Amino acid sequence: MVPMWFLRVANDICIPTSRNTHKYHNLRKRPSASVMIDISRAGLNLKGVLIRGRVELIYEEEARRINRSIHLKYVMPEALDDVKVSSYLSEGDDVTVKVHMDRLISWNLTDSNAGKALSVGGWFYPLNDELASD
C-alpha cells in the first residue's frame, strides 16, 4: 500500500479505508501488508520507509475515532464540521487498517550511487512550490 493519509500510533501505522475497496477485501483474505511511505521533502532529499507487518482491521466506533485523528492530521478541525467534507470522509473511511510493524526498512536515494550520479550530473528537476501545485 502507498497511503495518502496515515497516522503512526506507537508501533503501528493506521490507514483509513472503505469496505468497498479492493484493498479492504484483499486484506480480509490475507491480513498482511507492505506499506511504502515517501518522506522526501524536496529536490534530492529522496527518502522513505517500507513497513511490513500483519494487519488488523478496525471497525465501528474505534475506526471512527482513529480515522478522525488521521483526518485531523491533514485538515483543519473546521473542515470536519462542513457537511460535504464530513459525510465524504465518514462514509468513505469506515474501516481502519492497522499495520503492526514487524519489519521497517528505510531507503535514501541521496546516499546511493544512483542518487549521487544523478546529483552530480544535475539530472533532477528541482522540486519547488510552483511544480508541486501543478
Predicted regions and their residues:
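Short acidic (Asp/Glu) patches
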Residues: 19-21, 33-37, 76-85
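Charged, gly/pro-rich active-site loop segments
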Residues: 47-134
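Short glycine-/acidic-enriched loop or helix-start segments at secondary-structure transitions
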Residues: 1, 24-25, 108-109
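A solvent-exposed, acidic/Ser-Thr-rich amphipathic alpha-helical stretch
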Residues: 11, 43-46
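Short, surface-exposed beta-strand-loop junctions and turns on beta-sheet-rich folds
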Residues: 7, 21-23, 42, 113-114
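Short secondary-structure boundary/capping segments
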Residues: 5, 25, 41, 87-89
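Short beta-strand segments
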Residues: 1-19, 27, 34-38, 50
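Amphipathic alpha-helical interface surfaces
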Residues: 20-26, 62, 66
